[in-house]
Amino acid sequence: MDIKYSVDLIESYLDLDRTPVGIKFFFDWEEFEKFEVPQRDRKVTYCNSVQLASRGKAMKLTKENQGCPNGAMALKMREVPEPMANGKGRLSKNIYHNIEISKSISDEMLFLEEEPVGIAVMPLENYELEPDIIIIVSNPYNIMRVIQGHGYFNGYTSNLRTVGLQAVCQDLTTYTYNTKDINITLLCPGTRLVANWQANEIGIGIPFEKWYEIVQGVKETTNPFERNKEKEGIQKRLRERGLDASNIRFNENYDDGSYSGGKIETRG
């Protein structure tokens, strides 16, 4: 499996409205300069760069491009000020009940430990080099399917952590980068404002080391988990991309014969 093929597969097996986004950190200036993607010519919040990439935009970013102080802190492109580190900053805005809780949020967030000279943010399918992180923002159903694909090879997902704050920069990017494991986010008010995510969208961050097995896991769990209506769409998308659709089996699910009483009935 290669990157382009993996994107074709995931976009066939999931009905995505946005393309998966790849994030690559550069710690060598010469390598960053040689990476043939235009550098952003003005500031942008990191989360909005991810949103733009999910719609096809590719860009490189340095600390001068950072339009959000919290995103820059997560990416080690700005020092964490003492009021943020000790919890007083967020407590002053009435986000948390007391100083202990507020400080615990800062203590438990995992930011980059080394400052990158730059970052590439672009559609995953554009990469030839391996990115560090893959981000998918979609509806809860598709994120469920990604987690099921992860579970196929990895079992129960026990590490998911989120608090509705620093959703794209920390939940999906730096936490995933540090732990080398997947994480989800329900997003946060800040990114929903500046990146204009839809109300029904949530996200998942995936380390590249797990990407191919997750794609394969989504494929392998299609027949037990997807219903006939969704299978029809998958089959159609596979064929449109010239991919093999012969493994799609209808009228077959993991819970066949498990339920009594049928679906809930509603009266008009």
Cite the ranges covered by each PLM segment.
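Acidic, serine/proline-rich low-complexity intrinsically disordered regions
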Residues: I3-G268
